Amino acid sequence: MSEHRAILRIAVPSILSNITVPLLGWVDTAIAGHLGTSDYLAAIAIGSALFSVTYTLFNFLRMGTGGLTAQAYGSQRHDETALLLLRGLLIALGIGALLIALQTPLLHFGLSFMSTSAPVATQAVAYYRVLIWGAPATLSLYVLNGWLLGRQDARTPLLIAVVQNLLNIGASLLLVHGFGLRLMGVAGGTLLAQWVGAALALFFALRTLRRHGSTPRLSAAFRNTGAWRSFFTVNVFIFLRTLCLVAVMFSFTAFGSRRGPTLLSANAVLLQLFTLVSYVMDGFAYAGEAVGGHLVGAGSAARFRRLVRSLFAWGASLSLLFSAVFALGGGALIALFTDAVAVRQAAESYLLYAVLLPPVAMSGFLLDGLFVGTTATSGMLLGVAVAAVGFFALHGLLAPTLGNHGLWIAFLAYLALRGLVQGAQLPTIVRRSFAPSAAQTAH
């Protein structure tokens, strides 16, 4: 199979899966928006924000599991892929149980950052307390999706995402309008979809294992302390890297809020364009992760180098296409997100930054995938940490005189630094991944 076909076999379903990610929240929002009071809508906005931050921090479960599984699968160690799945699920269930146990302090901490009325806060708490019971399922699904992707299967996660969203729509509408449960019906429909999605993913994973005669045993999962150490090391670096990402994105919004509601809204609209780019680039990053990890496990250095070239050819082409679309049709795209004249005018005055975002950000996205596939997660952390320091330093220097332009320049510099720092490390990581000692370890 050519590198281009291997990339597209993972990237296209992954992009479609990525597009479905916000749908669970959109469905809740759309249903709540027709319940007769804005309090329900505001409560879901707050609850969704709290869960978004929480689950983003634990995305390492998907990435770490995916990279390690891809390498084990590439070296035909099917028993090890089974143990990786079991270790990941044990950690996911443990974290999920901890989140449930700590829901009250976590809820109070999250709400301390929100400015809202008492009725909205009451509804947000009720919504949160229902959906927190989906934490073990959501985190387990991260592990299962990463594991399936590591085995070069991107279609099953897409199928699960579609089933989840259809079930969420149907169950939420039934509970809200059929049983009159209002906000609790919205939460209940989402909770049901989360658990069914996890159960469905587990079914497909176990079916895959049975085909290869691999059955993970709990005792075997605990026996190899070295494997646990490796699993935790890979994931700790991803977790710290995610903290840096969240800090930058949160600060971008916070810094923009100081410029008033119009610029804050304009920045939010332009970031939606960046989100669209990220869904596509992440799909190709997943391909780099899955195919790259598989080639590391198989010891195919020449094919890995061809994979890198093919990935960047796709990335460069698509990023330039996005830039052209934003440059030529940016005004129309902005109008899709808002009809507020002041916000549209402000967003259009900063449109150049959205045009520059795709090519500047492209390397960071693709290298993330390759670094996960080679389990070089310390390099990912270094790249994002250096870039984050650059963002805060540049913003401090430029914002006092350039205002919102300074914020966007700092953000572009952050994205560029991510790619540059990680790109500088790539040759060393490739040599290390395919060194004789590494190949012996993989096999």
Language-model segment annotations:
Residues M1-A11, T69-P136, L167-G170, V176-V236, ...:
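Short alpha-helical transmembrane segments in multi-pass integral membrane proteins
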Residues S14, N18, T29-A30, G67, ...:
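Transmembrane alpha-helix boundary and packing residues in multipass membrane permease domains
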Residues R9-D28, V130, G134, L141, ...:
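Transmembrane helical elements of multi-pass membrane transporters/channels
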Residues L41-A101, T138-P157, A266-A324, L328-G330, ...:
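Small-residue-rich hydrophobic transmembrane alpha-helices
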Residues S2-L35, A49-G64, L68, L93-I100, ...:
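N-terminal transmembrane alpha-helices
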Residues W26, M63-G64, T138, V143, ...:
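Residues that mark transmembrane-helix kinks and helix-interface sites
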Residues A161-N168, Q272-L273, A385-L394:
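Small-residue-enriched core segments of transmembrane alpha-helices in multipass membrane transport
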Residues P22-A42, L111-A118, L174-L181, L243-L276, ...:
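Helix-terminus/linker motif at the lipid-water interface of multi-pass membrane proteins
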